[in-house]
Regions:
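Short loop/turn motifs that connect adjacent beta-strands in outer-membrane beta-barrel proteins
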Residues: 26-31, 118-119, 134, 167, ...
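Short acidic/polar hinge/loop motifs at secondary-structure boundaries
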Residues: 1-3
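Membrane-proximal, glycine/serine-rich, low-complexity loop/turn segments characteristic
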Residues: 5-240, 248-251
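Transmembrane beta-strands of outer-membrane beta-barrel proteins
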Residues: 33-35, 122-124, 170-172, 260-266, ...
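Hydrophobic core residues within well-ordered beta-strands of beta-rich domains
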Residues: 31, 107, 120, 154-156, ...
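Gram-negative outer-membrane beta-barrel proteins
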Residues: 41-47, 130-136, 178-186, 255, ...
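Outer-membrane beta-barrel transmembrane domain signature of Gram-negative proteins
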Residues: 93-114, 201-214, 280-389
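Outer-membrane beta-barrel pore domains and translocons
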Residues: 36-40, 127-129, 175-177, 250, ...
Length: 389
């Protein structure tokens, strides 16, 4: 809703419009169960085709020659890029195809149940979602050491409606979700994609021929290559859990005067996040040429390996919400009118990782009072009056 008159009853928070969300409720009748399982294969977004090592080196030579500079690679070196007879110093790596899969699977499962009688009705829903990552991983790692960018989420919801009396309705609701996100240790998505687009095919081999992990040796800055960064530096786990509960009481006061109604809502929500990072790094080497005596590669260790380290953290908050509404609508012949009063109270407080700042442990509160008066004659002439505080 964006009409100023319609949103005025929601106070200042409705200034930019109001979105009303209605969740499914139970229906009287026999139990009804719906189940659905889906799977899909998602192909990766179209990525650019990069030139190979020989083309890249040849274009580099052409760019230098047109500027009256000497060639970076001699013909015999270009031949090594083509034949890959010396991949330690003349590599040819398609980083995009090495790191990214062509596609990945997604799974969806959903279960809904509803039913009940004339007095009580219920609706229960549960769902599971899994999106597998599109990064290739090192299959020699342990099964519980996953460096892919996976996502899993569990959702649940339960709504119960109880007719306490013919004029009194009690609504109970609880909903929540638990989500887990996995990612490579030292290469988040932004960093890894930057490496895939920024690393040229001759910057560094994936590994040296003796199995050493390389550091970029064609840059003034030492950098991990994309494969080492995405598969050999550990992994990150992020968990997020949120629970939303609400109680609604609807009381019809037609026995006092027709059209008089009271609705009271109370909500209590919690939102918690936990993360754990387990990082490691192998020995990283730089090849500085070959020995004139033996012809063997001379390696320089640039960074020493360190075993898996662990860091963790968490955050959390809770929110309480109270909404009281009293309304009266009545028609007398061609005259139609209504009066509505609404009181809202919202409180939010951090519960985890509040630190030493006293303000972090204090609730943020908001109170509002709003009202609305409407009148129309024969649905032709309308008068609305709204206020909010």
């Amino acid at each position: 809703m964006k009409d100023a008159s319609a949103t005025a009853i929601y106070g200042s928070k409705g200034a930019n419009g109001v979105v009303l969300i209605t969740t499914k409720r139970g229906k009287a009748g026999k139990i009804n169960i719906d189940a659905k399982v889906e799977t899909s294969y998602n192909t990766r977004t179209i990525t650019p085709e990069f030139v190979d090592g020989l083309s890249y080196a040849s274009l580099m030579n052409e760019a230098l020659v047109t500027r009256n500079l000497g060639m970076a690679y001699q013909p015999e070196e270009l031949e090594l890029f083509r034949t890959q007879m010396d991949p330690d110093f003349y590599p040819n790596v398609d980083w995009m195809d090495l790191i990214l899969k062509n596609g990945a699977w997604s799974y969806r499962a959903n279960l809904n149940m509803n039913g009940g009688g004339n007095t009580a009705r219920y609706f229960v829903s549960a769902s599971y979602t899994e999106d597998q990552g599109m990064y290739n991983t090192d299959q020699t790692l342990r099964d519980d050491y996953d460096t892919n960018a996976n996502y899993k989420k569990w959702n649940y919801r339960m709504n119960v409606d109880i007719d306490i009396t013919k004029s009194t309705l009690l609504k109970l609701g609880i909903a929540g979700s638990l989500a887990k996100r996995n990612s490579p240790g030292l290469a988040d998505n932004e960093m890894l994609w930057g490496m895939l687009f920024g690393y040229n095919p001759i910057a560094t081999p994936v590994y040296y021929s003796n199995g050493y992990a390389p550091i970029s040796h064609r840059d003034n800055v030492n950098k991990l290559n994309p494969w080492v960064a995405s598969t050999q530096t550990g992994y990150n786990e992020d968990w997020q859990n949120n629970v939303q509960t609400n109680v609604t009481l609807e009381q019809n006061f037609d026995f006092i005067t027709k059209g008089l109604k009271f609705v009271g809502r109370f909500g209590y929500d919690t939102d918690n996040s936990n993360w754990i990072n387990r990082h490691r790094q192998p020995d990283l080497y730089k090849a500085n040429g070959r020995s004139q005596e033996t012809g063997e590669i001379i390696y320089e260790k640039m960074f020493s390996a360190y075993d898996m380290t662990q860091s963790s953290g968490s955050s959390g908050k809770r929110r309480e919400f109270l909404d009281l509404l009293l309304s009266w609508e009545r028609a007398f012949g061609n005259h139609h009118g209504g009066v509505t009063f609404r009181y809202t109270q919202d409180s939010e407080k951090r519960t985890v990782d509040i630190g030493t700042d006293i303000k972090n442990g204090v609730s943020k509160r908001n109170q509002g009072l709003a009202g609305r008066f409407t009148y129309n004659w024969n649905y032709r002439y309308f008068v609305d009056f709204n206020f909010g505080y």
